[in-house]
Regions:
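Glycan-recognition and catalytic cores of secretory/periplasmic carbohydrate-active enzymes
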Residues: 1-304
Length: 304
């Protein structure tokens, strides 16, 4: 799905006269709501859910292990909205609002966001995922076992907060704001995590898109715990063994690590918050020192 939600919409924005690019995007998007008429249906309008996780232009696989709704299905909202922007066809927007509203309702049904849902909208917990052997559907390779933010990470990685933001702007329906807040509110407690870029970025987006500063007092408490000064020198580390070693969001087994190089040649785990976190701190406080620290932090990492 990445070419259709990341590359093509941006490319078409730069090259709006490229009809071939538009045709490719619309050719994919027409399957989302069963509009093509030449392949098996992807979407179940009775349950407002996709028929499967494994769907394509040739096969819609309906084996038992495929009958779940994941964070990845949010990507079809982003694709349909992109199709609406380039074509002006109302069906793409209507479907996006309909499906987005149903996903929002399911998110709001319980306090903790599950790793995935069955096709009737029931959450599937981690113990059941282990029993069924469907860890790959839950993206278990990207979060530690028992991580309470695992479900949120799955939604972040598929752009759920950004999809809800688009739907809120287009419809004004408060349910999209409520669902987005349900996703981002638990992330405030991760702001001191040096690897939490997706969390800080989502909080920043939520705060501006929904004009909601209700989390600011909690964010300020986190900011107060930040190190007073940045490290003198960073170190870039490549662990020998690929593994998820921390909780929270934004971790990969194969990611590089950052360390703080001390004068005596010892490398300590980095304590400096991420550039995205300092950007959020600047937005909340208006203190330009946080903006300066974000830019310096980011430029140093890019240089390395």
């Amino acid at each position: 799905t990445e070419p259709f939600i990341l590359f093509l919409p941006r490319y078409i924005g730069l090259q709006p006269e490229d009809q071939r690019a538009i045709e490719i995007l619309l050719d994919a998007a027409e399957h989302i709501g069963n509009w093509s008429g030449v392949i098996e249906d992807w979407y179940d309008y009775q349950r407002d859910a996709f028929h499967s996780f494994q769907i394509g232009s040739k096969v819609v696989r309906k084996e038992t292990r495929d009958l779940y709704e994941l964070g990845e299905h949010f990507r079809f909202i982003l694709m349909a909205l992109a199709a609406h922007r380039v074509s002006g066809e109302q069906r793409y927007l209507d479907w996006s609002i309909r499906y987005g509203r149903k996903r929002a309702e399911r998110i709001l049904l319980r306090e903790e966001i599950p790793l995935l849902w069955d096709l009737s909208g029931n959450p599937v917990d981690e113990a059941e995922i282990q029993r069924l052997g469907i860890q790959s559907l839950a993206n278990s390779q990207h979060h530690k076992l028992g991580n309470p933010l695992g479900g949120i990470e799955n939604l972040l990685s598929s752009g759920a907060v950004y999809a809800f933001g688009d739907l809120y702007r287009l419809s004004g329906d408060q349910i999209f704001k409520s669902a987005a807040r349900q996703i981002v509110a638990p992330l405030v407690g991760t702001l001191s995590d040096p690897y939490n870029e997706p969390a800080a970025a989502a909080l920043s987006y939520y705060r501006s898109t929904f004009s909601d500063e209700s989390l600011d007092s909690e964010i300020l408490l986190q900011i107060e715990s930040f190190p007073t000064n940045p490290p003198d020198e960073l170190a870039l580390l490549f662990p020998q063994i690929y593994a998820i070693r921390e909780g929270g969001v934004g971790k990969r087994a194969d990611m590089v690590r950052w360390g703080e190089w001390t004068e005596d040649g010892i490398i300590k785990p980095i304590q400096e918050p991420s550039p995205a976190t300092f950007t959020l701190a600047f937005q909340v406080t208006g203190n330009p020192l946080y903006a300066e620290r974000a830019l310096k932090n980011a430029s140093t990492r890019l240089m390395m």
